[in-house]
């Protein structure tokens, strides 16, 4: 069968955006697409739940409210910090930052409310851009 999974970011700890409301509306939109293409294309409803461990109650509400076919777990920032994309890595001890990042990833895995883990080396792409180094 031909199929597609439609997912979108939901960085649950976002300060400037109501991701709960967005997730509900996005799920409803995908459900309409599922119905429209039923019998022709398998459409899966998914979500990339970023930083789910930082707002577990909100995350659990989203996952309980919507019957996702696939949930991607990810960490785009450390708790109470900006996304790794925005950091000036010259101001950080990289080893310490990565240790904290992988500890957060470990907590995410222990939480386990997802089907697959996204981009495990996410900060490394931005560290490389700043420092020219790519090492673990």
Show where each model-derived region lies.
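Alpha-helix termination/capping residues and helix-transition junctions
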Residues: 65, 111-114
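A metal-dependent hydrolase metal-coordination microenvironment
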Residues: 1-99, 103
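Internal active-site segments that recognize and position negatively charged phosphoryl groups
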Residues: 104-108
């Amino acid at each position: 069968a031909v199929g597609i999974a439609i997912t979108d970011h939901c960085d649950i700890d976002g300060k400037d955006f109501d991701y709960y409301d967005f997730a509900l509306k996005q799920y409803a939109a995908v459900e309409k697409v599922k119905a429209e293409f039923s019998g022709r294309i398998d459409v899966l409803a998914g979500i990339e739940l970023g930083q789910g461990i930082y707002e577990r109650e909100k995350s659990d509400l989203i996952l309980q409210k919507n019957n996702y076919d696939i949930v991607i777990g990810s960490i785009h920032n450390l708790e109470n910090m900006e996304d790794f994309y925005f950091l000036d890595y010259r101001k950080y001890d990289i080893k310490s930052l990565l240790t904290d990042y992988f500890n957060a990833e470990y907590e995410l895995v222990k939480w386990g409310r997802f089907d697959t883990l996204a981009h495990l080396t996410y900060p490394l792409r931005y560290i490389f851009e700043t420092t020219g180094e790519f090492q673990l």
